[in-house]
Amino acid sequence: MDLVEIFFEVVYPIFPFFHQPTFIRQVSRAEYTSERSTFSVTIALCALVSGRIRDGSVTNSKWDLEPLHKIPPEIFYNEAKKQLLNFTAESSINVLRAHAILAIAAIQNGKIRDMHQHLGAYHTLVAMDGLHDEANWPAGIGFVEREERRRLFWSIYTLDIYSSVVWGGIIRCSERQSHVSYPSEVIDDEMINDDGTTSEYPLPLETSGRRGDCWLSGWNFITDLYRVLEHALTRFRGSRRRATTNSFLVDMFEDDFTVTKSSVSESVSRMYLSLPYCFKETPPMTYNAKKDRFGYQAANITATFQLLRIVLFAASGSSIEDRCQIANQVVEAFASIPIAYLLAISTPLLHHLGGIGTILGNVLEEPLGEADYTRVRGVMLSMAQLLENLEVIHRSTSASAKIRSQVSRIDEYMHRQQHVTPPAAALGAPGAMVELSMPEGRESQNFPDIIPDISMDWILPENGELLGDLAWNFNLN
C-alpha cells in the first residue's frame, strides 16, 4: 500500500492515470487478486515507484523506505510484462495504463527500447479500437472512467512528443487527428464520481481562463505546450528535409510553412505570462500532497517551456553567442526549480536537459575561435554543476564527470595553442592569460576578460577531436 500512496505523491501530479479514491479503494479491497488486468496495472505501478525509490526520488521523511528496497524494481517490472502477455489484443483501460506506466518505468531504468515497445503496444491498442476518438470509447463507461481515459490519453500524447524530441523518434499521435477532450478541471478527485462532478466550478475549458485554484488547470496548460511543440517539431524536421530533398510538397503546401519561429515564441510567451502566479514559480516542497501538486505543475511547465524554446531556437539559424545564451538560460531555469521536485520527477525531467545538445550540437560541427569555445565551455560547466546536484537520480557521477573531463581537454588544448600561436596584440603582456585550472568550488569561467571577442588567428578542431564523444542526452542510469 505504501508504494501506491507514494505513487500519488510523486508520480500522479505529472501522470494522473487514476481517479485516486477509486484506485485506493480497489487496492485496499485487494481487487487485484481476482482481476488480472487490475493486477497488471498495480504491479506496473509498483515497478515504477520502486525504481523512483531506488533512485532517491522520494525525499519525504514520513516514509520508511528501507522495507521498500527489499524487492528490486526489476521483479515488479518483469512480472508486469509477463502479465501483459495475456492481453495482447485487449484495450481495457487497465491494460492501456499498464503499458503507459511501464513505458515511464523503462525511461527510469534507461531501457529506451522497452519504452518504445510499451508505447508501441499502447498506440497499437488505441489504433485497433479507434480510441483517439471519444465516440469509439466503450459504451456505458461512467464519468470517472471517462475522466481517467482523458487523462491517460493526453498524458501519453505528451510522452509521445517528449520521446520524439529527446530520442529523435517519430510522432505516433497527432493532436490534429485526436478527438478527445481535456480532463475536467476539478480541484480534487473527491469532487467527481460516476454521477458527474460535484465541483461548483463546472467551467468548460474552451471558455475559461487558467485557474489558480486547480492544479489540473496547470496540467492542461502543459498539454497545450506539447501541442505547440508537436507543430514546432514537425516544422523543424520539415525544414531539414526540404534542405536535403526537392520535395513537391513544399510548393503544394507552402502556406503551412509561413509562420515564423519568432511569432510562435511570442505567442507562447504570452500564454505563459497569462498563467496564474502559482504555475510560474516553484515554491519549496511542503510534503502536503495537495499543495505540492501546484509545485509539480510549475516545475513541469518550466521544463516543458524551456524544451519548446530549444526546439523553436534550433529551427532558426543563430550565432554561437545566441545559442550559448539560450542554453545558459535553460540551465538557469532548471536550477531555479527546488531540488526536491527535480528528484521526484526524476529521470524523465532530466532528459529535457539533453535538449541543450540540440542547440550546441551543431556548434561543434563548425571550426570555432577561442572566444566561441569559451562560451561553450561556460555552458558545459553550468550543466555539470546542475547534474552534479542531481547525481543521486542516476546513481553515478558519469554525466557531470564526463562534461568536466571534456572541459579539461578543451582547457589543455587552448593552453597549448596559446603557446604555439599567440595572438599578435594582446598576449605579450605579462600575466595576460590566467591560470586555466578550475579553482576549488568555483564554476565561473577562468579566461580573462581581455580576450577579444573576435576571430582569433587559430581555430579549435572541429567536431570529434574534443567533444565528439560527449553524449548530450546523457546516460543517466
Placement of each model-derived feature along the sequence:
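Acidic, Ser/Thr-rich, low-complexity intrinsically disordered regions in fungal proteins
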Residues: D2-L216, E230-D255, E266-R293, Q325-L342, ...
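Short gly/pro-enriched beta-turn/loop segments at secondary-structure junctions
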Residues: F23-R29, N220, Y296-A298, A303-F305
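TPR repeat positional signature
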Residues: V41-T42, C46, N94-V95, H99, ...
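Fungal C-terminal regulatory tails
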Residues: N86, E90-S91, H231-R235, R241, ...
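Residue-level recognition of tetratricopeptide repeat
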Residues: I104, Y162, R309-V311, S316, ...
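Alpha-helix C-terminal capping/termination sites
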Residues: Q108, V166, Q306, F313-I320, ...
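Active-site-proximal loop/helix segment associated with metal-binding centers of metalloenzymes
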Residues: L225
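Long, well-ordered mid-to-C-terminal structural blocks that present hydrophobic/aromatic surfaces
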Residues: Y287-Q297, R309-L312
